[in-house]
Each structure stands twice: as structure tokens, then as C-alpha cells.
Curated annotation (Swiss-Prot):
Gene source species: Latilactobacillus sakei subsp. sakei (strain 23K) (Lactobacillus sakei subsp. sakei)
Keywords, sorted A to Z: Chaperone, Cytoplasm, Ribosome biogenesis, rRNA processing
Classification via SUPFAM superfamilies: PRC-barrel domain, Translation proteins
Protein name: Ribosome maturation factor RimM
Keyword RNA-binding set for record: no
Main location: cytoplasm
């Protein structure tokens, strides 16, 4: 079975002429994910291209990364617009029992705990303020936004691919 990879960022551009790339992070562990010596992979159309971080610095809302052996803009130009991933085996941080990686949550089927109604699947997680918000894609309806609160998200079963919720009254419009 091939190893699982998780997205940690998106390469949006090059920076300068010395092979730096500009990355928008999609991980909460930027210092760990982008530190010198970390093995990552660029998701290219023909597969994953392995890279090793040789330098990292923050610049405005971006992270500027340089990769070993790729010290010229021409070496990294083809990475623009592609996702940056990390192998599951490279993730060495320990999560608490009630903490999850975004990549583990995205794609879960969201089910009403009380009656088994399926609302759809988590398509993304946004961070608008004090707590994360799950964006649930619903067929033929507008997206459902659920705050990541213990009063709303009742149970997460990563193995089964399901999250059980109790949607507060008034959060869902009657769109029938």
C-alpha cells in the first residue's frame, strides 16, 4: 500500500532568482513542517517530486522555502501552482485525543446524531476567528457552515469516515 501524503501548503510563485518558492501554508505546524531538513513532495501532474527544505523564512503572509540542490529560479519555476505535501511517516508531532489534522477531517461524511440524516461531506475548514468552521458541501443546496465546538461536533470517527453532529436550531435554512 502506498504511503499517504498530506497537503501542507501551495507553491504560489517563485521569489527572487536563487530558487526560493513562495508558499501559502495549509498547516498549523509551519515551523515543524518547513524547518531545514524536512522531506516534502511537490504534487506534479506526473506524480510526487521529492524535495528537502534547505532554508525557510517568513515574508508577509507567505513562507519562502528553498530546497536542497535547487538553487536557481529555473529549477523551481515548474513548481508554481502545485501543492506541497508531507508523508504521513514524516509527521512526528503528537496530537491530543480531541485534536485532528485538517486532512483527516476533510472528506468526512457529516451525520445528524439524533436521526442519522447525512448533511454531506466536509470540503474545507476555514479559520475565521476563535474556532474553526467546517464547510459542508450539500447536494443541490448551499454549503452548511458548522463551528468546531463540542456542543455541535459530537463524535469524530476517522476510521469510519464519519462525523456525528448536533446542528443548532436555525442554522439550516429550509431550502426545499
Amino acid at each position: 500500500m502506498p504511503e499517504k501524503y498530506y497537503q501542507v501548503g501551495k507553491i504560489v510563485n517563485t521569489h527572487g532568482i536563487r530558487g526560493e518558492v513562495r508558499v501559502i501554508a495549509t498547516t498549523d505546524f509551519t515551523e515543524e513542517r518547513f524547518k531545514k531538513g524536512t522531506h516534502l513532495a511537490v504534487e506534479m501532474p506526473n506524480g510526487l517530486t521529492p524535495v528537502t527544505v534547505s532554508a525557510m523564512r517568513q515574508h508577509k503572509q507567505f513562507y519562502l522555502l528553498q530546497f536542497e540542490g535547487l538553487g536557481n529560479i529555473n529549477d523551481v519555476e515548474l513548481f508554481k501552482g502545485h501543492n506541497l505535501k508531507i508523508a504521513a511517516s514524516e509527521r512526528d508531532d503528537q496530537l491530543e485525543d480531541d485534536e485532528y489534522y485538517y486532512g483527516d477531517i476533510i472528506g468526512l461524511e457529516v451525520i445528524e446524531e439524533s436521526d442519522g440524516t447525512s448533511y454531506g461531506k466536509v470540503s474545507e475548514i476555514i479559520d475565521p476567528g476563535p474556532n474553526d468552521v467546517w464547510v459542508i458541501k450539500r447536494r443541490g443546496r448551499s454549503d452548511l457552515l458548522l463551528p468546531f465546538l463540542k456542543s455541535v461536533i459530537k463524535k469524530i470517527d476517522i476510521e469510519a469516515g464519519k462525523a456525528y453532529v448536533e446542528v443548532p436550531e436555525g442554522l439550516i435554512d429550509n431550502e426545499d
